[in-house]
C-alpha cells in the first residue's frame, strides 16, 4: 500500500515534488521520504504513460528529474535505484536526465540544474 499522498501504479508508489532542486538534492530528499525511495525510474511505456498523467496536469509542459544519470559510472547511465536501463527514450545525452511532462522525451542536463522531480519506491 502507498501512503495517502503517494500515487500507486504497478506495485510502486510515486510522488511528484513541486519544488525545484538539483539532482543530488532531489535524490537525497527521495531517500528521506523512505529509505527505499529514489528518483523515478522507467521500465515500460505503460509506466511512462502513468507518469505523464501524474505530472502534466500539475506541472504543465515542463521537465522533471528522473533517477537516470552517469554519476556512478561515467561511461554508462544507470537508474539511481540500481536497476538496469531496459527502456529508453533519449532526446540527447549528458550527465543527469530529466523527462518531459508532455511526451516523456528524455533530456540531459548538468546535474546542478534545478528541476521538479518524482520519487518512487516499491510498495
Curated annotation (Swiss-Prot):
Q: Which Gene3D superfamilies match?
A: Mannose-Binding Protein A, subunit A
Which InterPro entries is this protein grouped with?
A: C-type_lectin-like, C-type_lectin-like/link_sf, C-type_lectin/snaclec_domain, C-type_lectin_CS, CTDL_fold
Q: Which cysteines are joined by disulfide bonds?
A: 2-13, 30-119, 96-111
Name the residues that span the membrane: none
GO CC terms, sorted = extracellular region
Q: Where does this one sit in the cell? A: Secreted
What PROSITE patterns does the entry give? C_TYPE_LECTIN_1, C_TYPE_LECTIN_2
The alphabetical list of record keywords is:
Disulfide bond, Hemostasis impairing toxin, Platelet aggregation inhibiting toxin, Secreted, Toxin
Q: Which GO molecular function, any one, fits this protein according to its record?
A: toxin activity
Q: In which tissues is it expressed?
A: Expressed by the venom gland.
Where do the coiled-coil regions begin and end?
A: none
Task: Determine the domain of life of the protein's source.
Answer: Eukaryota
Q: Where is the C-type lectin domain?
A: 9-120
Q: What does this protein do?
A: Binds to platelet GPIb (subunit alpha) (GP1BA) and functions as a receptor blocker for vWF binding to GPIb. The platelet GPIb-binding site resides on the GPIB-BP subunit beta and not on the alpha subunit. At a final concentration of 104 nM totally abolishes vWF-dependent shear-induced platelet aggregation (SIPA) at a high shear stress, but had no effect on SIPA at a low shear stress.
User: How does the annotation summarize its subunit structure?
Assistant: Heterodimer of subunits alpha and beta; disulfide-linked.
The UniProt family comment states:
Belongs to the snaclec family.
Name of the featured protein: Snaclec GPIB-binding protein subunit beta
Provide the species name.
Answer: Bothrops jararaca (Jararaca)
Amino acid at each position: 500500500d502507498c501512503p495517502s499522498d503517494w500515487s500507486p501504479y504497478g506495485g510502486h508508489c510515486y510522488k511528484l515534488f513541486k519544488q525545484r532542486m538539483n539532482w543530488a538534492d532531489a535524490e537525497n530528499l527521495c531517500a528521506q521520504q523512505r529509505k527505499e525511495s529514489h528518483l523515478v525510474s522507467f521500465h515500460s511505456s505503460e509506466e511512462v504513460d502513468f507518469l505523464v498523467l501524474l505530472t502534466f496536469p500539475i506541472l504543465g509542459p515542463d521537465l522533471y528529474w528522473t533517477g537516470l544519470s552517469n554519476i556512478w559510472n561515467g561511461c554508462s547511465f544507470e537508474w539511481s535505484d540500481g536497476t538496469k536501463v531496459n527502456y529508453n527514450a533519449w532526446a540527447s545525452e549528458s550527465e543527469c536526465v530529466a523527462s518531459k511532462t508532455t511526451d516523456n522525451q528524455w533530456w540531459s542536463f548538468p546535474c546542478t540544474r534545478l528541476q521538479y522531480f518524482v520519487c518512487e519506491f516499491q510498495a
